């Protein structure tokens, strides 16, 4: 029995897949906590699709896909940030416009160069076939991103919670947002290898959403989100060996299975707890004393 459980670790490609999935899942979860705080989950979706033209263009021109993905991801992030600052358009309109534009350009490039673009790798990822140089590239991206996030997490919290207060204490919201989106773009590029462009959104939303239901303290939220992201990603890669299924699909399914109990049974913000409090308020409405009795 033990030999069967340890069997995936006998294969170098599985060890690499589990390791890379764990570190990518951890840092994506770190970022997801801020996306939940700001209500920017759609931003993660937009960035995950905005890297498609970069990947497709890099494949078509023979350049490293990571460089192309990072370039278009950063371009999309900067466009969304700057357009928000110089126009009166709502954020959801800006995100929807840029998301659809970049994804359309990516599909156009794929249609023009169908033989030079590995569409399946873009959409579903290819973590089991990741090369050693790609592992090193992902490790560098994740390490740099994690160190920067650990250094500025309180500054980002101030900006995402209250920009006016952040400015009053000498922080630059615009610069910190650009830095955040730079890190988000870099981690999106890393996550492409793990789950592909379509499912990246789950890795930068689900862990943070789950943790958001379980605690009101941001420090704890970060720890819970990172733990969920790392464990589900590593175990998903491990489990995919036995299921013989898409690694990205297994990872995201596991994250959803962790989210659902929190959604229903979280002690304070779960669906059942919320409904219970609502019923109590209906049965025992607050008593308002007349002003003469105060």
UniProtKB/Swiss-Prot annotation:
InterPro entries: ABC_BtuC-like (IPR037294), ABC_TroCD (IPR001626)
Gene Ontology cellular component list: ATP-binding cassette (ABC) transporter complex; plasma membrane
Family: Belongs to the ABC-3 integral membrane protein family.
GO biological process: cellular response to iron ion; iron ion transport; response to zinc ion; transmembrane transport
Transmembrane parts of this sequence: 17-37, 51-71, 93-113, 140-160, 169-189, 194-214, 221-241, 246-266
Taxonomic placement: Bacteria, Pseudomonadati, Pseudomonadota, Gammaproteobacteria, Enterobacterales
Subcellular localization: Cell inner membrane
Gene3D superfamilies tied to this protein: ABC transporter involved in vitamin B12 uptake, BtuC
Job of this protein: Part of an ATP-driven transport system YfeABC for chelated iron.
Keyword Manganese recorded: no
Highest rank taxon of the organism: Bacteria
Protein encoded by which gene: yfeC
Native species: Yersinia pestis
Membrane topology classification: Multi-pass membrane protein
Keyword annotations from UniProtKB, A to Z: Cell inner membrane, Cell membrane, Ion transport, Iron, Iron transport, Membrane, Transmembrane, Transmembrane helix, Transport
Protein name (Swiss-Prot/TrEMBL): Chelated iron transport system membrane protein YfeC
Pfam families, sorted: ABC-3
